Swiss-Prot record:
Signal sequence annotation: none
Active site: S153, Y168, K172
GO molecular function: oxidoreductase activity
Name recorded for this polypeptide: Short-chain dehydrogenase/reductase SAT3
Other known facts: Trichothecenes are sesquiterpenoid toxins that act by inhibiting protein biosynthesis.
Binding sites annotated in the UniProt record for NADP(+): S17, D40, N67, Y168, K172, S203
Pfam families reported in the protein's UniProt record: adh_short (PF00106), adh_short_C2 (PF13561)
Pathway(s) annotated for this protein in UniProt: Mycotoxin biosynthesis
Role summary: Short-chain dehydrogenase/reductase; part of the satratoxin SC1 cluster involved in the biosynthesis of satratoxins, trichothecene mycotoxins that are associated with human food poisonings. Satratoxins are suggested to be made by products of multiple gene clusters (SC1, SC2 and SC3) that encode 21 proteins in all, including polyketide synthases, acetyltransferases, and other enzymes expected to modify the trichothecene skeleton. SC1 encodes 10 proteins, SAT1 to SAT10.
Protein family per UniProt: Belongs to the short-chain dehydrogenases/reductases (SDR) family.
Gene: SAT3
Alphabetized CDD domains for the sequence: SDR_c
Documented EC number(s): 1.-.-.-
InterPro entries: NAD(P)-bd_dom_sf, SDR_fam, Sec_Metab_Biosynth_SDR
Length: 271
């Protein structure tokens, strides 16, 4: 995402992560443009520290992507098990702490990230009115590209398939509704809220679903068939983010954009 934004002309991109080594490695590729900030989204103090750094450095943001995520417990409601085995798998073998931590990172952490940056997003709109990015297309008008939050949800938010881990699915489903709620209630302030719900893109979280697979060789009879016959890649993700961030996507607010190669259309889902 950050690579796409920089390639699209972003003057500065702040990247937040708990892992300093990941931050420093990413920032080294774009020194002075990609700014690393160590941050834990489950800590209000850490979020405030990140906000303070951005406030001091630039004073505003035009776009906030809340991309935090953890898979959490992978114990599923597997109907190949007996009812005794099923209970043991999902009750005895999963702790309240592990289940709730999934929601803490994926839902609460993402939501509080948005809340922490509200004033900086508002400042982004004010900067646009002064001639900055997203300035009015007509004199005296509103910003042509209003400040925006993009929440990264997931295909899992809409999945009813037994392969979907319940904690992860619940956390992303909750996030999608929080985003819709926020888009309604932040409209007064000119802050847009949209959701990106990706399917299978190779990543740490997706390893369980992508390892030892070649979607190009699969067909409709395969349980995890993807109609596009490929996993998502940098172009699909980067292009989608650029669309939402640009004038082309400036009319989107409260949108759930599913980017999944058609996977949702061939599985048990709620979408």
């Amino acid at each position: 995402m950050s690579e796409a934004l920089i390639g699209g002309g972003a003057k500065k991109v702040y990247i937040l992560s708990r892992r300093r080594d990941v931050l420093e490695s990413a920032a080294a590729k774009h020194e002075g443009i990609l700014i690393p900030i160590q941050c834990d989204v489950t800590s209000k103090a850490s979020l405030q520290s990140a906000v303070d750094i951005v406030t001091k450095d630039s004073g505003y943001v035009n776009l906030l992507i809340a991309n935090s995520g953890t898979l959490g417990p992978t114990n599923r409601l597997d109907h190949d098990l007996s009812i005794h085995e099923l209970r043991k798998n999902v009750f005895d073998n999963v702790s309240f702490e592990d289940f709730n931590n999934t929601l803490s990172v994926n839902t609460t952490g993402a939501y509080f990230t948005m809340l922490a940056f509200l004033e900086l997003l508002d400042a982004g709109n004010k900067n646009a009115l002064k001639g900055g990015f997203g300035g009015p297309s007509t004199e005296g008008g509103a910003p042509s590209i209003q400040s925006q939050v993009i929440f990264t949800s997931s295909l899992g938010a809409y999945s009813r398939d037994r392969l979907s881990p319940p904690a992860y699915s619940a956390s992303k489903s909750a996030l999608s509704h929080l985003a819709k709620h926020a888009s309604t209630n932040l409209a007064k302030y000119g802050i847009r809220v949209n959701v990106l719900a990706p399917g299978l893109f190779p990543s740490e979280i997706a390893t369980l679903m992508t390892a030892n697979r070649d979607p190009a060789t699969e067909n409709l009879g395969d349980r995890m068939f993807i109609p596009a016959r490929k996993f998502g890649g940098a172009e699909e993700m980067g292009g989608t983010v650029l669309y939402l961030a640009s004038r082309a996507g400036s009319y989107c607010n409260g949108l759930i954009l599913v980017n999944d190669g058609g996977r949702l259309s061939v599985m048990l889902s709620e979408y």
